[in-house]
């Protein structure tokens, strides 16, 4: 997918729309995290894209929904003592998550159709937005496939499908945010002591990998492990990191290994970002914003782990990862523009 270069003629309303859509994705990530952390995701056992807009109203409808839930592994194994009011609470959280997904989808689709009809979008933009539209539709399908994995024989969703669901949200967010940056920031006047984009590509890749392992940590409940993993009683527990067979399966299926990799990548990103700012002396506010956001993200992560994954901290930890990715994407965009403008880099 090629981001439109000819953005001088993008009207203000399109720019505002792209910004709103990007914020909408962040809100979806936040609400999705809350839905997972409150264990609400499996309370709605059917996928009804149209009639699912309407929640149960009468007592009879609520009883019917709970009867469906009572046939799920989650109810049979974990929530067999759940009260009717507790079920309603879980149901409404998941309902709001799905409703918000529909709203965000319409916020993207309806203005897109309007702007296309009014010929406010060039051909390249139209193609880009069609791709995003398809990805949004697929995200809805992916969300249901994730939920479905927890309705068969296990009281929890597949951590692979959970990760795919989050990464697809990241891809959609990236495409919207990148298109917004291309429409709004047409030139850069600052001086940066850097003449290539490699370092920011490396940081972007590491953030994506970190988000991937963060999702695996969530899906495997690795954040609830003992607080000194993988260092117990002053010794390195290699046997805990590599006990699964085949060995490579530890990378994705062993909670201790997944949590350890998540921690190592966090330190690696901190070292690279700090070194980039110190060595290159990037006198550019967004570069310092990147470091500040990273430190906040690390703080959220550490506190989330220490305090047994509280909902507020864990939700903020997840959405801050997307914000960190957005800031780095902004820096990458600025460096690319500087190269295109043939700006002479100075110390």
UniProtKB/Swiss-Prot annotation:
It is found in: Cell membrane. Its EC number is 1.17.99.9. One of its GO terms (cellular component) is plasma membrane. Heme binds at residues 262, 317. It is a multi-pass membrane protein. The keyword Kinase does not apply. The chain crosses the membrane at residues 14-34, 95-115, 125-145, 166-186, 198-218, 260-280, 289-309, 311-331. Pathway: Porphyrin-containing compound metabolism; heme A biosynthesis; heme A from heme O: step 1/1. Disulfide bonds: none annotated. One of its GO terms (biological process) is heme A biosynthetic process. Interacts with CtaB. Catalyzes the conversion of heme O to heme A by two successive hydroxylations of the methyl group at C8. The first hydroxylation forms heme I, the second hydroxylation results in an unstable dihydroxymethyl group, which spontaneously dehydrates, resulting in the formyl group of heme A. This is Heme A synthase. It comes from Ehrlichia canis (strain Jake). The lineage of its organism: Bacteria, Pseudomonadati, Pseudomonadota, Alphaproteobacteria, Rickettsiales.
């Amino acid at each position: 997918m090629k981001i439109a270069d000819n953005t001088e003629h993008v009207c203000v309303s399109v720019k505002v729309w792209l910004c709103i859509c990007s914020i909408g994705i962040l809100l979806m990530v936040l609400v999705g995290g809350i839905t997972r952390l409150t264990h609400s995701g499996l309370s709605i056992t059917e996928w009804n894209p149209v009639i699912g807009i309407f929640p149960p109203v009468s007592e009879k409808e609520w009883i019917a929904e709970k009867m469906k839930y009572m046939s799920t592994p989650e109810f049979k194994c974990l929530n067999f003592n759940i009260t009717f009011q507790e079920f309603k609470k879980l149901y409404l959280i998941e309902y709001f998550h799905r409703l918000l997904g529909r709203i965000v989808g319409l916020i993207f689709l309806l203005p897109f159709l309007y702007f296309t009809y009014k010929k406010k979008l060039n051909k390249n933009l139209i193609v880009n937005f069609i791709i995003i539209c398809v990805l949004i539709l697929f995200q809805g399908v992916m969300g249901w496939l994730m939920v479905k994995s927890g309705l068969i024989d296990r009281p929890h969703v597949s951590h692979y499908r959970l990760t795919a669901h989050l990464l697809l949200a990241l891809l959609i967010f990236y495409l919207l945010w990148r298109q917004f940056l291309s429409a709004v920031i047409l030139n850069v006047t600052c001086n940066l002591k850097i003449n290539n984009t490699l370092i920011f590509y490396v940081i972007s890749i590491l953030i994506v990998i970190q988000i991937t392992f963060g999702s695996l940590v969530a899906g495997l409940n690795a954040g609830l492990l003992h607080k000194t993993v993988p260092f117990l009683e002053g010794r390195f527990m290699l046997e805990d990191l590599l006990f699964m067979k085949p060995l490579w399966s530890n990378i994705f299926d062993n909670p201790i290994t997944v949590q350890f990799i998540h921690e190592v990548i966090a330190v690696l990103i901190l070292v690279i970002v700090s070194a980039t700012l110190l060595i290159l002396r990037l006198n550019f506010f967004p570069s310092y914003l990147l470091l500040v956001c990273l430190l906040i993200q690390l703080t959220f992560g550490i506190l989330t782990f220490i305090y047994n994954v509280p909902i507020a901290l864990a939700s903020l930890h997840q959405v801050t990862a997307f914000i960190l990715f957005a800031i780095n994407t902004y820096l990458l965009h600025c460096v690319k523009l500087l190269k295109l403008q043939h700006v002479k880099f100075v110390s």
